């Protein structure tokens, strides 16, 4: 098998990068639609007088922030020269674990492990923002 020339490798990389960009753009548009649906769902839950609706409202708010953070991550990807900053993934992880704490608190061990995971992610965020690991 003949080795590929540098220009062909760059062409393949460009094609794959464009496919990735198109996929992320499509995902961003789908998330915007879901964000709109969640807005309507939150408005419905806000005006329902039942106690269960308050629980749904809080859960919906956290899901709303997850959609919002994923959209912000995709926007940041395109604005920062096709690069995903690590801290955005950490923010999404923290929000997802907070959602788990609110929604799924069946066992006491989970109630202890979820905040420990958040602490680990906050330490990770602190390390990523320190001068030693900061990227220019």
Swiss-Prot record:
Family (UniProt): Belongs to the PsiE family.
Main location, first listed in the record: membrane
Keyword Plastid listed: no
Any Gene Ontology CC annotation: plasma membrane
Keywords per UniProt: Cell inner membrane, Cell membrane, Membrane, Transmembrane, Transmembrane helix
Membrane topology (UniProt): Multi-pass membrane protein
Protein name: Protein PsiE
GO biological process: cellular response to phosphate starvation
Localization annotation: Cell inner membrane
Residue ranges of the TM segments: 15-35, 55-75, 83-103, 108-128
Pfam families attached to this UniProt entry: PsiE
InterPro entries to which the protein is assigned, alphabetical: P_starv_induced_PsiE, P_starv_induced_PsiE-like
Transmembrane helix among keywords: yes
